[in-house]
Amino acid sequence: FLMVECAITDAGGHGNKPEVTVQGTLQVDWAVKSAVEFARKHNNTLVMVTADHETGLLTCGFTNDPPGKLVMDYATTSHTAEPVRFFAYVTARTAHVLHRTFAA
């Protein structure tokens, strides 16, 4: 069992600093890539990725004038009730049905 946490994305949300949030996201991406590479070599490994909460409610969009300029803005400096994503990388050997009473 290995758990990896990246507090950088949380700090970026609390501080309303998109550049910090992006840096943390890139670090998580690197960690996930490493875990998936390991799982591909060791087919009894399951990789799960999620977050414990969302912070800042970052929104992104594009302007009309000038066209296509990226705009990023936060709605808060606190944790939000927004749902977070859950991803899994499953090999054929680790794929099986888990009765819902055993899933948290």
Region spans (language model):
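A post-motif C-terminal structural segment
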Residues: 1-104
